[in-house]
Structure formats: structure tokens, C-alpha cells
Swiss-Prot record:
Its EC number is 1.-.-.-. It comes from Arthroderma gypseum (strain ATCC MYA-4604 / CBS 118893). Keywords: FAD, Flavoprotein, Glycoprotein, Monooxygenase, Oxidoreductase, Signal. This is FAD-dependent monooxygenase nscC. FAD binds at residues 35, 46, 119, 326, 339. The keyword tRNA processing does not apply. GO terms for molecular function: FAD binding; monooxygenase activity. The gene is nscC. The lineage of its organism: Eukaryota, Fungi, Dikarya, Ascomycota, Pezizomycotina.
Length: 412
């Protein structure tokens, strides 16, 4: 019983942090989640959950049915939708269907999930409420495995057995214990816009192209313009768009990595002019244009990835620090697998901790960390490389897309 009095300190209330907390709590292991932001923090955009991610989570939560997840997180859940996506790619200058995966099974293998709803659903999957403390921005960590302290900017201090760094791509924990591991900036332009439509307008402008899919992906000549449903009700639809492309040679006015947060919310004139010159087809032309931008919330996103060597991960583990989520395997959002691996991290780490604490060994925290990294390191780091490669492939020249479409037609 003495082991179970130890508290695990989790830094970050994102998908990885909450998954770990929920599973530890369900297994009777005390833990506290610390989040720098306030409870009203919003990340309402949608992500794609793949079968390898959601099935592992559902199993860990007690073999919950997929329908439970869908009813809780699908962007179109309110109207009876399932978060389905067609995984098709269309030419955003003609509307022509370029790539459409052949459906070999009726089973839904990808579920679109509203990020806010997913965090809440995970937090609610247990009898005991999670202990999440907002407004706690980490300042530093002290100590070692088994006796480690987290010190916060609000002067609060908490002692625990282990610190789980779930604090994202710009991890404060990582920057302190592994200062040489820094995010790598991907040379791509990425702007993200949020807007709302009435159901009538949505059915008129987007539904003819998207059908029941929760995302409509448009690809062009080295640039992409996906439209995605974030939340849908009977009367309104909250959507977002992305505009991403490769960096141009010379002085690219839109390539501005490391912008301050307030500056990233401003719409540069160069973006307005560029979108106005794209000559997009419907429905993209209705939203990615200079006039529409005036009523949209627009953000500049810097695309980063994080790689971590196994030696670095183990070194931090010896100090009582273990990483989950984007803090050690950040990858591109579009075409990436980050959310899925965040779920796997939470499941695998909690399993390792539960198993180690049930053993009679003295150095059980180190055993738990070593067990977790024995499989999670290779899995996650390979995913970063795979996702980054896929991100560039999705920004290929228009001629390549046409060639792919033509080959597809010949073989069908």
C-alpha cells in the first residue's frame, strides 16, 4: 500500500496528459494534472483518430464500444453523425475527384473528433473525477525519481514520485532537462481560419461536394485547402479551413516562423493578396478569399516536429521525467498522427506504471519508465518521420496529382 500513496505529477491537460491521468486514476494511482491555461481554454478544431489509436484507448478504458466515443466526440454527433470522412482528395481548382480510397470494409477506420470534446470525454470516462489544476504554469523541476518537485510561477510547489511531461511541442519540462532537444521548424506556410455557417448555407455550398464527410480536402499546385467541420448542430456549422504550401525561393513574405502569439493572429496583406489570386473552385472559393477573411478568425501556425534520441529519453527518465505526446514526438497536424500517438503514450505509460507498482522491486519508477520507452520510443519517432514525409507528399506539384489520378483511372 505504501507505493500507492505516491503522487504522479502530470504537466499539461491535453490529450496525452488527460489519457494518462484517467487511466492512472481508474487504477487507483494518485495523480494531479497541472495546466497553465484557464478552464475555458479552447482548441475546438477536429483531428482524425485512426483505428490503432482509438481501439487501444477504448480497450484500456474497459473495452468501451466505439459508439460511446463517436457519440461523445464526433463533430456531427448532435445530428446523429459518426465523424466519418471519405479520405478523398479533390482538385481545388476544378473540384474534380483525384484520389478516392477503395472501401474494402464497412467498418469505420477513421473517426473525426472535436479536440475539446475528446478531452472532456476522456476526463469523464471513470467514476472518480480527475484532479486538474488550472492556472499552474511550470517554472522548474527539482529532485529525482521517487522524490521530485514541480515549482510553478504562482509560487505553488508539489512533491511527487514522477513528473510526466505532457506540455506540448514547446515543453517547459523538456527545455529544462534536455535543453539540446529543440523543435525543428518545417519550411512550410500554414494559415488556419475559423468561421460559422447556417445549416442552409452549408448544405448549399459544401454538402454537394463533401456528402456526409466531415472533411473536404482540396489539393493544388504545391498547396492545400482542406475544409473541416469542427461542430455541427441542427441550425449551424462551425468550420475551419487551412491554407498550406511549400516555402518559395527567395524572400517569401508569408514564411514567418517564431511569430509572437499576438502577431500570429493578424492577417498579413501578402496572405490576402495570395488567396485572392488562387482561382479556386467551389466551395473553397467562397471562404478562402479576401472578403471572407474579414469575418474569420485567422491564425498563423508554425509547423514543427520534435525528435528525441533514446539516450535523451532515458537520461530524463533517470531524473524522474517521462515524456508523452507532442513534448517528445510533435509532428505536422495535416497528415500527421500526433493525436493517435498521444493516446498510445497515455495507455502504454499508465500500463507500465501500474505493472511496476504491482511488483516487489524497489526501483519500480525506473522500471516503469524503461518499460514504457522500450516500445514507445521507436513507435513514436518513426511516426514523426513518416508524418513529416507525408506532409511534403501532400504538397506535391499539380502535375503529380493529375498523373496519380490518371493512373487510378486506368486501373479501375
Amino acid at each position: 500500500m505504501a507505493k500507492q500513496q505516491r503522487t504522479v505529477l502530470i504537466i499539461g491537460a491535453g490529450i496525452a496528459g488527460l489519457t494518462t491521468s484517467r487511466l492512472l486514476t481508474n487504477n487507483g494511482i494518485p495523480n494531479i494534472v497541472f495546466e497553465a491555461s484557464t478552464p475555458d481554454r479552447s482548441q475546438g478544431f477536429a483531428i482524425s483518430l485512426q483505428e490503432f489509436g482509438y481501439s487501444t484507448l477504448l480497450s484500456a478504458l474497459g473495452d468501451l464500444p466505439l459508439s460511446s466515443l463517436i457519440k461523445g466526440v464526433a463533430p456531427d454527433r448532435v445530428i446523429g453523425g459518426t465523424g466519418w470522412i471519405d479520405q478523398a482528395l479533390r482538385d481545388n481548382r476544378t473540384g474534380e475527384l483525384l484520389v478516392a480510397p477503395e472501401l474494402t470494409t464497412t467498418k469505420q477506420t477513421v473517426v473525426r473528433a472535436n479536440r475539446n470534446a475528446l478531452r472532456q470525454w476522456i476526463a469523464d470516462c471513470g467514476d472518480e473525477e480527475l484532479d486538474v489544476r488550472y492556472g499552474h504554469k511550470l517554472q522548474r523541476v527539482e529532485g529525482k525519481a521517487g522524490n521530485i518537485t514541480a515549482v510553478f510561477e504562482n509560487k505553488a510547489k508539489y512533491n511527487g514520485s514522477l513528473i510526466i511531461a505532457a506540455d506540448g511541442v514547446n515543453s517547459t519540462v523538456r527545455s529544462q532537462v534536455l535543453p539540446s532537444v529543440v523543435p525543428e521548424t518545417i519550411p512550410l506556410i500554414h494559415y488556419h481560419g475559423e468561421f460559422q455557417l447556417s445549416r442552409t448555407k452549408f448544405d448549399e455550398l459544401i454538402r454537394p461536394y463533401s456528402g456526409h464527410s466531415n472533411i473536404l480536402v482540396g489539393v493544388g499546385d504545391r498547396f492545400n485547402t482542406p475544409l473541416s467541420i469542427c461542430n455541427m448542430s441542427k441550425s449551424h456549422v462551425h468550420l475551419d479551413w487551412s491554407y498550406s504550401r511549400t516555402v518559395k525561393e527567395g524572400n517569401d513574405l508569408l514564411y514567418r516562423p517564431n511569430l509572437p502569439s499576438e502577431e500570429a493572429k493578424k492577417i498579413p496583406l501578402a496572405l490576402v493578396e495570395e488567396l485572392g489570386a488562387l482561382d479556386l473552385a467551389g466551395p473553397w472559393k467562397h471562404f478562402l478569399n479576401p472578403e471572407s477573411l474579414k469575418s474569420h478568425r485567422v491564425f498563423h501556425w508554425t509547423t514543427r516536429c520534435v525528435y528525441m534520441t533514446q539516450d535523451d529519453a532515458r537520461s530524463a527518465g533517470e531524473k524522474g521525467i517521462v515524456f508523452v505526446g507532442d513534448s517528445w514526438h510533435a509532428m505536422p497536424i495535416f497528415g500527421g498522427e500526433g493525436g493517435n500517438h498521444a493516446l498510445l503514450d497515455g495507455v502504454e505509460l499508465s500500463n507500465a506504471i501500474v505493472t511496476a507498482m504491482a511488483s516487489t522491486e524497489k526501483d519500480y519508477w525506473s522500471k516503469a519508465v524503461a518499460s514504457y520507452y522500450s516500445s514507445a520510443w521507436k513507435r513514436s519517432q518513426e511516426a514523426v518521420r513518416r508524418s513529416t514525409q507525408r506532409f511534403f507528399l501532400l504538397h506535391r506539384p499539380a502535375a503529380d496529382w493529375r498523373e496519380i489520378a490518371e493512373k487510378k483511372r486506368r486501373t479501375t
